[in-house]
């Protein structure tokens, strides 16, 4: 075994490229590089010979394409190697795809390789990239301004559909490959396009590589080390970036939202890496066209003092900054749809944002306006009311203030994203006086209830049901889905140790504890029994009433049993204190409490859980079983609800 063979074997072992039970598909063009790789693998004994086959794609781009195909067929037939050949008119395909020749050739080539691998149950694709290719690639990406993920160049292996692409020849040079081919008397075709200065790579090969080798003959090993160290750095930052995105990313139908409150405080290198990781996710890993400029544009938008801005990214991806959120969505920018409605007394209109507005005479009983209602003195306005978009120059007379204020300034003060402002309903009377922008601001025409005056009441009702609006109602993701599951695994291990051999009765407190209990008990590896109890002191409100009611009692007796109570959150503690005392009164052998969340700031009675998942701040939290007005229980994470939702 000569030095070249030894280095390739060492590289294969170092990067775990080939195992004895692998099946290899060798991509062979008919040139010296791929033919040498095939010869090396065929004679290496790394895998049995019957585990090796060949794929050749005839692009019909070069005059000697037929000769290249013939070289592959001849060699494979002489050695008894199975081979698969496909012919594609790449020029025609490029026109139909509206892509460049090189990009199209790569697409059809890998489609062919992956198809063969799937049909023949092959798990490794061997490619003949070498050390010269590596230097050229790194330099080209740096000069072009590629994102930093590309600085490490060609990787020893990468994932494909159903397998991996491997590059065993990366540690050896083009010259060494030619020597190998000549030594073994391999007949190959020379690609005449490799000498054309029309192609960028060829210019690097002809002009830069000779200079670098002349400056330092060890340039190959230096670039190899640079590639490996850069790749290691990338993987380390990638893991941190992935964790950062898990905590700050919401997938909401066609829109993906990055929460900026915490994200923008992270170090710049981590922000850049996270943005690139996010773009790769959005583009389904095909983000080769993403450059440093794209990433810096997004970072600048995040760090800018301008709270409302947007940029267009490749392939019709739009990034919209809306104060503390950055939205990504594919498609053309939405042109604001104009609307204009007349609202007569006792009428109700439906808006495109799934909200409705109703105008009625006030009833004889006292009514409060709230955030979703407004009382008007009939003598001060002219019907019908008008519900429309904002228009340039709109001004509102403010309650408790002298003079009027531009709607634009009101929206800025309220932090309404620019792209949302044209969608908001503006309610005026028939003479044009602006009365109300629901959810934003009421005018000076807002009145208190009067028994003596004729008054109208406007009701604005927003549908907060449904998946899309549900996520939009969340101010911040407090605990991600991954963090929840990691903590549940930890609690499961602790409870397994605690209750092994004791056959506890596990009591779930309905309804909120159901998701937590379901996931937790999957992680408790011992015999147990389950029961449920519904005990409440909240009703449909947001503040504990202090009165505890049993809505559903236990089916099983707790007498003499070890009881484990599972709850979603301990807030005031009244409900849990009552329940624990009740179970003790019923002569349980022991009672312990496990809660997913503990909110000490809300405590009104002395009670502590034996097992706690997370301590949370004094915020209105929902999701993963926790609700507001029976909504949001099905969120997969714990989030902080926007105040305007539970204040309505």
From Swiss-Prot:
Entry keyword annotation includes Electron transport: no
List GO BP terms, alphabetically.
Answer: purine ribonucleoside salvage; tRNA modification
Q: In the UniProt record, does the keyword Kinase occur?
A: no
InterPro entries to which the protein is assigned, alphabetical: Hxn_phspho_trans, Lysidine-tRNA-synth_C, PRibTrfase_dom, PRTase-like, Rossmann-like_a/b/a_fold, TilS/TtcA_N, tRNA_Ile_lys_synt, tRNA_Ile_lys_synt_N
**CC terms in the record's Gene Ontology section:** cytoplasm
* Localization of this protein: Cytoplasm
Q: Which Gene3D superfamilies does the record associate with it?
A: 3.30.465.60, 3.40.50.2020, HUPs (3.40.50.620)
Annotated ATP binding sites? 29-34
Q: Which SUPFAM superfamilies does this chain map to?
A: Adenine nucleotide alpha hydrolases-like, MesJ substrate recognition domain-like, PheT/TilS domain, PRTase-like
Query: Which controlled-vocabulary keywords does the entry list?
Result: ATP-binding, Cytoplasm, Glycosyltransferase, Ligase, Magnesium, Metal-binding, Nucleotide-binding, Transferase, tRNA processing
Residues binding Mg(2+) are: 627
Cofactor binding mode, per the note?
Binds 2 magnesium ions per subunit. One of the ions does not make direct protein contacts.
Q: What is its EC number?
A: 6.3.4.19, 2.4.2.8
Q: Look up the record and name the cofactor or cofactors this protein needs.
A: Mg(2+)
Signal sequence region: none
Q: Name one GO molecular function term.
A: guanine phosphoribosyltransferase activity
Q: Which reaction does it catalyse?
A: IMP + diphosphate = hypoxanthine + 5-phospho-alpha-D-ribose 1-diphosphate; GMP + diphosphate = guanine + 5-phospho-alpha-D-ribose 1-diphosphate; cytidine(34) in tRNA(Ile2) + L-lysine + ATP = lysidine(34) in tRNA(Ile2) + AMP + diphosphate + H(+)
Q: What is its main location?
A: cytoplasm
**Cross-referenced HAMAP family, in alphabetical order?**
tRNA_Ile_lys_synt
Q: What does this protein do?
A: Ligates lysine onto the cytidine present at position 34 of the AUA codon-specific tRNA(Ile) that contains the anticodon CAU, in an ATP-dependent manner. Cytidine is converted to lysidine, thus changing the amino acid specificity of the tRNA from methionine to isoleucine.
Q: Which family does it belong to?
A: In the N-terminal section; belongs to the tRNA(Ile)-lysidine synthase family.
Q: What is this protein called?
A: Bifunctional protein TilS/HprT
């Amino acid at each position: 075994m000569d030095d070249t063979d030894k280095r390739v074997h060492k590289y294969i072992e170092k990067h775990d490229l080939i195992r004895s039970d692998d099946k290899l598909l060798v991509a062979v063009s008919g040139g010296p590089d791929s033919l040498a790789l095939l010869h090396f693998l065929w004679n290496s004994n790394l895998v049995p010979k019957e585990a090796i086959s060949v794929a050749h794609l005839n692009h019909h781009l070069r005059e000697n394409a037929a000769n290249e195909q013939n070289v592959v067929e001849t060699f494979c037939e002489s050695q008894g190697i199975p081979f698969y050949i496909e012919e594609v008119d790449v020029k025609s395909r490029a026109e139909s795809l509206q892509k460049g020749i090189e990009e199209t050739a790569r697409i059809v080539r890998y489609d062919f390789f992956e198809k063969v691998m799937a049909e023949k149950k092959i798990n490794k694709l061997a490619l003949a990239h070498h050390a010269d290719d590596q230097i050229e690639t790194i330099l080209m990406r740096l000069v072009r301004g590629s994102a930093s993920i590309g600085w490490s160049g060609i990787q020893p292996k990468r994932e494909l559909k159903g397998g991996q692409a491997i590059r065993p020849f990366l540690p050896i040079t083009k010259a060494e490959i030619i020597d190998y081919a000549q030594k073994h008397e391999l007949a190959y075709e020379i690609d005449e396009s490799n000498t054309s200065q029309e192609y960028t790579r060829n210019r690097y090969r002809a002009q830069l590589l000779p200079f670098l080798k002349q400056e330092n003959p060890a340039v190959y090993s230096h670039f190899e080390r640079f590639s490996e160290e850069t790749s290691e750095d990338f993987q380390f930052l990638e893991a941190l970036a992935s964790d950062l995105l898990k905590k700050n990313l919401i997938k909401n139908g066609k829109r993906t939202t990055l929460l900026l409150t915490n994200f923008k405080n992270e170090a710049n290198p981590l922000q850049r890496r996270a943005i690139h990781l996010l773009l790769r996710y959005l583009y389904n890993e095909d983000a080769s066209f993403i450059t440093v400029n794209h990433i810096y544009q997004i970072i600048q938008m995040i760090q800018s003092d301008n709270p409302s801005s947007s940029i267009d990214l490749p392939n019709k991806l739009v990034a919209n900054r809306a104060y503390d959120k950055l939205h990504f969505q594919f498609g053309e920018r939405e042109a604001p749809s104009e609307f204009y409605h007349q609202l007569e007394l006792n009428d109700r209109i439906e808006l495109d944002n799934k909200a409705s507005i109703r105008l009625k005479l006030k009833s004889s009983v006292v009514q409060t306006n709230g955030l979703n209602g407004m009382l008007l003195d009939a003598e001060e306005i002219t019907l019908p009311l008008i519900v429309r978009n904002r228009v340039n120059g709109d001004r509102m007379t403010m309650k408790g203030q002298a003079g009027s204020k531009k709607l634009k300034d009101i929206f800025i003060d309220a932090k309404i994203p620019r792209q949302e402002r044209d969608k908001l309903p503006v309610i005026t009377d028939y003479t044009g006086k602006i009365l109300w922008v629901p959810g934003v601001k009421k005018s000076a025409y807002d009145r208190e209830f009067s028994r003596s005056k004729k008054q109208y009441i406007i009701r604005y009702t927003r549908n907060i049901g449904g998946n899309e609006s549900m996520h939009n109602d969340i101010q911040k993701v407090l605990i991600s889905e991954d963090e929840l599951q990691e903590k549940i695994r930890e609690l499961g291990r602790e409870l397994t140790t605690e209750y092994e051999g004791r056959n506890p009765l596990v009591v779930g407190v309905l309804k909120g504890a159901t998701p937590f209990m379901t996931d937790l008990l999957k992680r408790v590896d011992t015999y147990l029994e389950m029961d449920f109890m519904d005990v409440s002191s909240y009703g449909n409100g947001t503040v504990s009433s202090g009165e505890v009611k049993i809505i559903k009692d236990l089916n099983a007796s707790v007498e003499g049993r070890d009881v484990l109570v599972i709850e979603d959150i301990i807030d005031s503690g009244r409900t849990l204190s009552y329940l624990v005392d009740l179970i003790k009164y019923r002569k349980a052998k022991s009672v312990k409490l496990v809660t997913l969340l503990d909110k000490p700031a809300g405590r009104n009675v002395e009670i502590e859980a034996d097992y706690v998942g997370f301590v949370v701040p004094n915020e209105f939290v929902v999701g993963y079983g926790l609700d507001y007005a029976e909504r949001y229980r099905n969120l997969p994470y714990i989030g902080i609800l926007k105040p305007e939702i539970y204040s309505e």
